[in-house]
């Protein structure tokens, strides 16, 4: 799968529609939301690429919030080298053209799919780790 950079994400954002109505069932996801596999419309999702560095066996769990945001905040920036973005695949909905970041949250006793829209205007931080 194609590895995406911060510049790639910004370029894709410039062509993404702003909050379109969609029948895909994903719903609003301006911050990270839990989405069961049954609700993920796999048939209409097109994988665009990954943010994961396949050369790194275990990506970092360190988060980056330079403006005091938190993981679940809709204003939290996309930081490709930091958690959870360093584990994400980017998809495009074939119906509404929305861009969606998705990763698997794996805890001790559960597995949870998380989704967040890569909306136009969402800050995307640089490609170099700080």
Model-identified regions with their sequence ranges:
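Cys/His-rich zinc-coordinating "finger/knuckle" motifs
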Residues: 29-32, 36, 100-103
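Short cysteine/histidine-rich metal-coordination sites, predominantly Zn2+-binding motifs
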Residues: 37-50, 106-117
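Short metal-coordination and nucleic-acid-contact micro-motifs, chiefly zinc-binding Cys/His arrays
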Residues: 15-20, 86-89
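Short, charged low-complexity linear segments at domain edges
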Residues: 1-6, 50-78, 124-125
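Short, intrinsically disordered, charge-biased short linear motifs at domain edges
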Residues: 5-15, 76-84
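Short cysteine-rich clusters marking metal-coordination/redox-active sites
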Residues: 21-26, 93-96
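Short, compact, well-ordered microdomains
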Residues: 76-130
């Amino acid at each position: 799968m194609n590895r995406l950079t911060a510049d790639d994400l910004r370029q894709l954002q410039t062509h993404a529609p702003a909050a379109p109505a969609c029948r895909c069932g994903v719903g609003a996801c301006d911050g990270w939301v839990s989405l069961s596999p049954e609700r993920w419309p796999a048939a209409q999702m097109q994988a665009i690429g990954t943010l994961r560095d396949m050369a790194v066996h275990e990506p970092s769990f360190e988060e980056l919030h330079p403006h005091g945001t938190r993981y679940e905040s809709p204003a939290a920036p996309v930081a490709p080298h930091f958690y959870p973005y360093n584990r994400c695949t980017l998809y495009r909905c074939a119906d509404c053209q929305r861009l969606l970041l998705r990763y698997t949250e794996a805890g001790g006793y559960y597995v949870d799919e998380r989704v967040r829209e890569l909306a136009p205007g969402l800050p995307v931080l640089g490609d170099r780790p700080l």
